[in-house]
């Protein structure tokens, strides 16, 4: 073989090696890319769970780095409707009112749930709020009626905090011995209606399209959408969960146990008020505030959802640190997955 032929053979060999090497590198790169693409775990949760669930997201992703937790916060009713009406999927549904799960999701979209935490309603304010240095647990409804004072709450049609606000104000009439409180604060400033029954119970009617007097009332879809406007002085007082007020370092007054929806001992008092969401044909009875979670039946990765619930149940201190009294062990109802059975008590 002459020198020229030898050079050709050598060059051909080098080219073959490089080509083969490129194929290997490309395949390895593709394989590595496939192996490192994170799984998505989608969560629809109540706005008031933003702080604790942000912590649970960090915990879960630290333990399972191949999982990308993606959270969508909204009013709990809106969260449920994403699944039941808009055909969206999520691995976790976490509601500020656990009863939305049996009432709106079972049996078609869920067959179990766990009750994990509690809360109560308070009235938050800032130093920019009118008469902030005068308002008390005893006189808040009188302060609200003063000229120029504006109060806020979330939409009952989207958010449990919104319909709970209506219940709180209605229950206040009995607690304070003043039968005009709901009339003065709500009926005169919105198109809500209320039925007073012969047995002493009340049914608030929330229309499909809510209208409010914007000179007195500031309303948004969910309660956390109201925090910024409160802090900038767009309105004076906000009906909000105690945990959220604490998380955002807001001043607040507490309400009597007879109306704040935070006391199991007063469950019979709460049951005197209810609300119908007329656009959804859904009636909700006032009851102590309890948060619930489930993995929707149509979740794309059901087992990953169950594993996330397990992480929540194994770390109840996250709720406590966020100012939400935890239910430990959690109370479970329905066909609870075996992986969770040692972490719950059946209700």
Swiss-Prot record:
It holds the Pfam family SBP_bac_11. It comes from the Archaea. GO terms for molecular function: molybdate ion binding; tungstate binding. One of its GO terms (biological process) is molybdate ion transport. Residues 1-21 form the signal peptide. InterPro entries: ABC_trnspt_W-bd_WtpA, ModA/WtpA. The keyword Zinc-finger does not apply. Keywords: Signal. PROSITE patterns: PROKAR_LIPOPROTEIN. Belongs to the bacterial solute-binding protein 1 family. WtpA subfamily. This is Uncharacterized solute-binding protein MmarC5_1756.
